[in-house]
């Protein structure tokens, strides 16, 4: 039986638990103007997307989707470090208005939060989702249906949050959704803890990469992200590959992001994130007009109270220092809201 849009919305509103597929009625009739076709459209028309899906699913047999390289057979129900099952686990799917302005536009970024995570930071603000694994298991066909729903209600993109461990499911769902009419860009919203080999499977499919670069020091990464000592090496290599694939941030005539790299860096107390080194690395390895968001919203969450160096929020001075470093190294693609926050802080001094 064909599921109508009304039935889907009725069934998708699951409160107090895992899925909140918010319909936002005031935006339901909005039509976003899309410039051209997204990358996955070209791959499908060239006959390459089906091959990529098959190749990606093969990684489940001996899972090495992320740098942990657990080697478990997820096809047989084994679970590795991230604790993810074979089926994709989704916590929420809804328009999100707190992302970067070019992603949000007027009608929101179509954000899908996946449960579980391959990094498991001790300060994670989404720890019930990423670490405890709250969410509902759905088939790839259901994920495709969510993508279509988000497009139908006017979202400007499909924003895939914490996608690394479910990348094969995403690829299959995207192909299914394309056949049903999906035509908006894919945003790969990742912690940055990626393998270049895996990212190459996404070449031509992902339109916008939205990675974190959390740390520039191996000891900090090991301490605060569950032993991921190789995080700086893996994240910087991953970002270089992302830049090779999609280049710099591009928007349409309405200011809506269509493609490109958008880097996030969270300022942490006591210079834990290595922000000065981060700014220098971007300046030396990427175009200086690369989109960079210096984030000020660190707060103490999950197990951060157990670690003295990060057991407080950041100070105004720490944020201003971070922005000064970005400008000192000539970064001109700074997120406009970060710049406005900086200016407000300076005026209040």
Place the predicted regions along the sequence by residue.
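Auxiliary Fe-S-binding modules of radical SAM enzymes
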Residues: 2-5, 9-23, 29-76, 247-349
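Residues immediately within or flanking Cys/His clusters that coordinate Zn2+
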Residues: 60-63, 67, 79, 111-114, ...
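Iron-sulfur cluster-binding cysteine motifs and their immediate structural context
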Residues: 65-83, 122-129
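Conserved Radical SAM active-site core
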Residues: 83-204, 208, 218
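Conserved radical SAM core fold
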Residues: 130, 167, 192-195, 213-232, ...
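Hydrophobic faces of well-ordered beta-strands that scaffold small-molecule active sites
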Residues: 158, 186-188, 209-211, 261-263, ...
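Non-cysteine beta-strand/loop elements that form the S-adenosyl-L-methionine
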Residues: 203-217, 291-297
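Anionic-ligand binding region
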Residues: 233-252
């Amino acid at each position: 039986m064909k599921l109508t849009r009304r039935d889907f919305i009725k069934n998708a509103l699951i409160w107090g638990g895992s899925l909140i597929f918010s319909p936002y009625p005031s935006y339901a009739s909005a039509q976003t103007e899309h410039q051209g076709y997204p990358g996955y459209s070209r791959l499908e028309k060239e006959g390459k997307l089906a091959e990529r899906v098959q190749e990606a699913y093969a990684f489940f047999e001996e899972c090495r989707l992320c740098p942990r390289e657990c080697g478990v057979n997820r096809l047989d129900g084994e679970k590795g470090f991230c604790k993810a099952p074979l089926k994709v686990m989704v916590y929420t799917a809804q328009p999100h208005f707190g992302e970067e302005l070019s992603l949000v536009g007027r009608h929101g970024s179509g954000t899908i939060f996946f449960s579980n995570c391959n990094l498991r930071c001790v300060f994670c603000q989404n720890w019930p989702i990423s670490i405890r694994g709250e969410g509902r298991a759905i088939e790839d066909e259901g994920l495709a249906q969510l993508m279509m729903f988000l497009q139908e209600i006017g979202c400007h993109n499909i924003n895939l949050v914490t996608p690394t461990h479910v990348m094969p499911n995403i690829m299959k769902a995207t192909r299914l959704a394309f056949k049903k009419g999906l035509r908006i860009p894919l945003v790969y919203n990742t912690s940055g803890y990626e393998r270049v080999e895996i990212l190459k499977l996404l070449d031509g499919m992902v339109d916008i990469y939205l990675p974190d670069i959390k740390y520039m020091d191996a000891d900090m990464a090991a301490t605060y992200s569950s032993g991921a000592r190789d995080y700086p090496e893996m994240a910087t290599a991953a970002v270089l590959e992302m830049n090779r694939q999609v280049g710099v941030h591009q928007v349409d005539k309405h200011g809506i992001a269509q493609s490109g790299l958008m880097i996030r860096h969270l300022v942490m107390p006591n210079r834990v994130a290595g922000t000065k080194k981060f700014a220098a690395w971007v300046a030396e390895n990427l175009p200086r007009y690369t989109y960079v968001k210096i984030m000020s919203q660190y707060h103490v969450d999950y197990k951060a109270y157990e670690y003295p160096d990060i057991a407080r929020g950041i100070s105004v001075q720490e944020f201003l220092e971070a922005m000064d470093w970005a400008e000192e190294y000539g970064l001109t693609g700074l997120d406009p809201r970060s710049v406005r926050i900086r200016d407000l802080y300076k005026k209040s001094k």
